[in-house]
């Protein structure tokens, strides 16, 4: 099956459009993007590792089966451990996939899925009032693993689990973040 060719009508920008297309072609931009060539972006040398890190999404087609298998395995383990409430905790752009997961989920389980993307005390307390903490799994998503808001919410709910006398409160947390990030090291220590 072939996809229809997309049409672009740049109007008064036709000259600039054609110039940009020529530049992209002459610099072999598509191949360089797939090769994760950080030199394609004009940047300071110290930004190169950041650019390379941000291009790792290009590896997803090769990794997706393994990632899905791991997620299914983790979900089965969570159900076996008695978790029946799930809170996605994230800030900024990390929230987008979580919001989609909640909104696209089966309506019969939506009452047990929650999205927390705010540190507003009233919002946090309203959510907390709905949760049976002993049966709640918190999934923290942060690309960099450095967001102060995410860390504050992790510490808040960890404290709540400890205050409730829940054994092994670290088992109530899952982290999706970059390898080697602060959040990843915190998850490994738990």
Put a short name on every predicted segment:
Residues 1-79:
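Extended, charge-enriched "interface" segments that sit outside catalytic cores
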Residues 76, 80-190:
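Glycine-rich phosphate-binding loops that contact phosphosugars or nucleotide phosphates
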């Amino acid at each position: 099956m072939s996809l229809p060719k997309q049409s672009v009508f740049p109007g008064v920008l036709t000259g600039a459009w054609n110039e940009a297309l020529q530049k992209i072609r002459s610099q072999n931009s598509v191949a360089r993007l797939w090769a994760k060539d950080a030199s394609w972006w004009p940047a300071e040398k110290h930004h190169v590792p950041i650019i390379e890190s941000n291009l790792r999404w290009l590896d997803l087609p090769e990794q997706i089966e393994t990632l899905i298998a791991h997620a299914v395995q983790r979900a089965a383990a969570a159900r076996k451990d008695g978790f029946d409430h799930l809170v996605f905790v994230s800030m900024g752009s990390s929230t987008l996939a979580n919001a989609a997961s909640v909104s696209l989920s089966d309506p019969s389980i939506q009452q047990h899925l929650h999205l927390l993307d705010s540190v507003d005390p009233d919002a946090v307390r309203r959510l907390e009032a709905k949760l049976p903490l002993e049966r709640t799994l918190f999934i923290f998503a942060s690309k960099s693993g450095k967001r102060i808001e995410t860390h504050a919410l992790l510490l808040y709910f960890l404290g709540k689990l400890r205050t409730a006398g829940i054994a092994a409160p670290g088992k109530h947390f899952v982290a999706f973040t970059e390898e080697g990030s602060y959040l990843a090291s915190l998850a490994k220590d738990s």
